Amino acid sequence: MSGKPELAGQTVVVIGGSSGIGLETARLARGEGAQVILTARDSDRLHRVGRELSAVIAAFDATDFERLGRFFDELPAPIDHVLVTGPGPYYAPLAKFDVEQARRNVEAHLLLPLQVARDAARKVRPGGTLLFMGGTEGRRTAAGLAFISA
């Protein structure tokens, strides 16, 4: 081993990088020498994280697919790795089920990864990584999980 950090000189984009798994992944990538580019909806939190990690940041809702496309268009090429995390799942008993909230959840968990894959494909170098986080709710049964388990 040369002692060189594993991600030195690489660029890592984290969609949903201001908290949770996205933030911890960004911290690890930065610690391994990567340039980190973060997106998130919460502008204040994203700015704090951006300062902490010396990261490039872009505050917007990634389910705004037009804005997401512009984000990728404006990125320098090549990108080495893209991670997409999503908001938490939508749980509700059927009698209280909000169809509009469910639609937004489908958009964030199913359509967002497809859109990122399409938009990122023109920027990610050959051999690069597209990584999409999922959950385990589809394997569990309980009241209120019918939608997310589908």
Where do the model's predicted regions map?
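Flexible N-terminal pre-Rossmann segment of NAD(P)-dependent oxidoreductases
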Residues: M1-V14
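N-terminal Rossmann NAD(P)H-binding glycine-rich loop of SDR-like oxidoreductase domains
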Residues: S18, A26
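Conserved glycine-rich Rossmann-like NAD(P)H-binding loop of the short-chain dehydrogenase/reductase
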Residues: E32-L46
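Rossmann-fold cofactor-recognition segment
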Residues: E52-E66
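Amphipathic alpha-helical dimer-interface segment in Rossmann-like NAD(P)H-dependent oxidoreductases
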Residues: A77, A108-G128
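Conserved NAD(P)H cofactor-binding loop of Rossmann-fold oxidoreductase domains
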Residues: L83-A92
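Catalytic Tyr-X3-Lys loop
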Residues: A95-L114
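Catalytic loop of short-chain dehydrogenase/reductase
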Residues: N105-V106, Q115, T129-A150
